[in-house]
């Protein structure tokens, strides 16, 4: 008789407006065959039951101060430190969502570049408490980039990993790991775990790549070298560099760099900005997609199941984004295959395309392809998963190819209709690539005159850079790969300079809220008002071993002739992390017929 090696722990029952009841079931010694029917009655009730009330807009933009949140990622440049001396100056920072005290409420952690990071405890009813000082997670005096929550030591509590970037210098320049002490305090322990890496780190993702029951780490670093130094030189990708990306294997609580032996590139041309985890080829093993800025192609690493990866972007993709930023993977057409969206910098309007966009010559495009840098285009990429036939790039067909200078892509069901929608964070505070500005800079006489008149010529030049806030992109999935712009209809049209973003059900009402980290303005916190309009299913998992929250678990649900697939990988989008929950919109359906759970060790459970 088969015994369940992992247990589905939490099922959320929503009855009416905001009421929730938790069911916990721990049949430690009962067999899979015996559990089959008892789970049927449980899952049948894991539904958000709805009324008929309507709200003015799908989302309400909350005032952060009313919630107890006072944070702003403020950036200011000097003659010594600015976009010319540090190319990622305006890339912004992230936001990580996670339940740090297991009270069922999702807490918020914001990273800041020149601002201290902030941790806010969710007190319920849209009230948050700043516990940064008590928790000891401010990361003062250094440039923080991304953040993610993961139970590193397997004690059932979420720990925090913060990646550092910016110019060298300052205290605690290394990435920091904060181990949760269980009393709303954390202990910095990066050196003890081998995670005290120093570099231009962007984000980390924790997952169990070798299926041994603990969490390993992929660390994304942006090259410290200038872009032009390696432009299209052959043979660079295979040369390891100490500041390159790293795959770190968890060996009894200490993380060891295994990049070379596992087939992971760790070169000086890895200008990485995004990590995306998913089972792209359907073998129930976690794969990796790495989006690279500038001339280097994106990487698709398929998990071999033999303790390593094989990079297959040339075989699986016909086209890639050129200046790839953030990315996300999710099933956009409910065929049970994860699709992929990668952001780039193509403006939406013709006017802005003429003033912002530059294009490579045909000769350079052809040269890049011939030297192994793939066919790359200056637009977003929407990669439809065709199974054994690879991916089809269909961004122009879907109308999603141009969303401005974009960062995070998030694919999640914003209206609980059973189809995952698209959210993209946009904006660059100072547009270094504005063609009118570049033309001005090309006038040697004007620049020479500025140098003669002002000692602080760099700051003066940056003052002249255009700065225009733009709305973030919000598209409703209408099915059939058709998407509708919903910014104004859903109340999300505020112009901004947005970067890291994450989604999660902050008030446990059965719909997904959204938090966005902005540059030089308060964060956006959007309350989703869908709870009275459609049903939803939320699942959390608990696995045996040290991967306590079941990172990498896949669930497929069947209901009323429909199907939907979700994967639990918190790190996603851009420098950010969403909670350890899977969310399925159900529309008008009030019952789920069955759930198939594929655990990180590839065992399966069927719940009916």
Give, region by region, the residue ranges found by the protein language model:
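Beta-rich catalytic cores
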Residues: 91, 115, 143, 173, ...
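Beta-propeller blade termini
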Residues: 92-102, 121, 144-154, 201-211, ...
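Gly/Ser/Thr/Pro-enriched helix-cap/hinge segments flanking short amphipathic alpha-helices
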Residues: 52-58, 65-67, 77-83, 464-473, ...
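Beta-propeller blade repeat segments, especially FG-GAP/WD-type strand-to-loop junctions
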Residues: 59, 116-131, 171-188, 228-258, ...
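Beta-strand-rich domains and repeat architectures in extracellular enzymes and scaffolds
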Residues: 70-108
């Amino acid at each position: 008789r088969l015994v369940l090696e992992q247990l589905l722990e939490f099922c959320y029952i929503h009855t009416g407006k905001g009421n929730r009841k938790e069911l916990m079931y721990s049949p430690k010694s009962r067999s899979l065959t015996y559990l089959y029917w008892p789970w049927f009655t449980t899952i049948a009730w894991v539904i958000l039951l709805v009324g008929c009330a309507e709200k003015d807009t799908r989302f309400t933009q909350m005032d952060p101060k009313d919630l107890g949140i006072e944070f702003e990622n403020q950036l200011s440049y000097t003659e010594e430190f600015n976009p010319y001396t540090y190319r990622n100056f305006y890339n912004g920072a992230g936001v990580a969502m996670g339940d740090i005290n297991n009270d069922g409420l999702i807490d918020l952690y914001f990273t800041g570049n020149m601002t201290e990071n902030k941790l806010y405890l969710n007190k319920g009813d849209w009230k948050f408490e700043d516990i940064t000082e008590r928790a000891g997670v401010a990361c003062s005096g250094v440039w923080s980039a991304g953040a993610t929550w993961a139970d590193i030591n397997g004690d059932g509590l979420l720990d925090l990993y913060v990646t550092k970037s910016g110019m060298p210098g300052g205290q605690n320049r290394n990435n920091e790991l904060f181990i949760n002490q269980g009393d709303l305090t954390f202990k910095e322990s990066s050196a003890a775990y081998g995670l005290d890496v120093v570099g231009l780190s962007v984000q980390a993702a924790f997952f169990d790549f070798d299926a041994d029951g603990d969490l390993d780490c992929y660390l994304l670093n942006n090259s410290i070298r200038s872009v032009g130094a390696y432009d299209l030189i052959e043979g660079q990708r295979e040369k390891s560099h100490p500041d390159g990306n790293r795959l770190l294997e968890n060996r009894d609580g200490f993380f060891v760099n295994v990049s070379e032996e596992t087939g992971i590139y760790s070169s000086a041309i890895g200008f990485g900005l995004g990590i995306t985890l998913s089972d792209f080829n359907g073998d129930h093993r976690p794969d990796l997609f790495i989006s690279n800025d500038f001339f280097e192609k994106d990487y698709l690493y398929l998990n071999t199941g033999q303790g390593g990866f094989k990079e297959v972007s040339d075989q699986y993709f016909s086209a890639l984004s050129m200046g790839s930023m953030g990315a996300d993977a999710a099933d956009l057409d409910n065929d049970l295959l994860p699709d992929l969206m990668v952001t780039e910098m193509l403006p939406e309007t013709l006017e802005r395309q003429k003033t912002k966009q530059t294009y490579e010559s045909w000769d350079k495009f052809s040269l890049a392809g011939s030297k192994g840098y793939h066919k790359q285009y200056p637009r977003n990429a929407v990669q439809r998963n065709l199974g054994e036939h690879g991916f089809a790039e269909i961004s122009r067909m879907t109308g999603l190819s141009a969303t401005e200078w974009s960062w995070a892509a998030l694919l999640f069901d914003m209206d609980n209709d059973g189809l995952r929608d698209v959210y993209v964070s946009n904006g660059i505070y100072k547009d270094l690539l504005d063609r009118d500005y570049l033309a001005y800079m090309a006038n040697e006489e004007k620049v020479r005159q500025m140098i003669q008149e002002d000692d602080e010529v760099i700051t003066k030049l940056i003052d002249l850079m255009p700065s225009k806030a733009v709305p973030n992109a919000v598209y409703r999935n209408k099915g059939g790969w058709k998407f509708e712009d919903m910014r104004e209809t859903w109340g999300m049209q505020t112009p901004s300079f947005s970067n890291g973003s994450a989604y999660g059900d902050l008030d446990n009402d059965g719909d997904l809220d959204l938090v966005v980290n902005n540059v030089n303005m308060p964060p956006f916190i959007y309350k989703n008002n869908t709870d009275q309009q459609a049903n939803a299913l939320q699942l959390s998992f608990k696995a045996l071993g040290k991967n306590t929250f079941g990172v990498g678990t896949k669930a497929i649900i069947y209901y009323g002739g429909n199907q939907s697939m979700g994967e639990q990988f918190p790190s996603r989008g851009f420098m950010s992390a969403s909670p350890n929950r899977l969310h399925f919109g159900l529309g008008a359906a009030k019952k789920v017929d069955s759930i198939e759970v594929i655990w990180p060790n590839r065992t399966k459970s069927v719940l009916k």
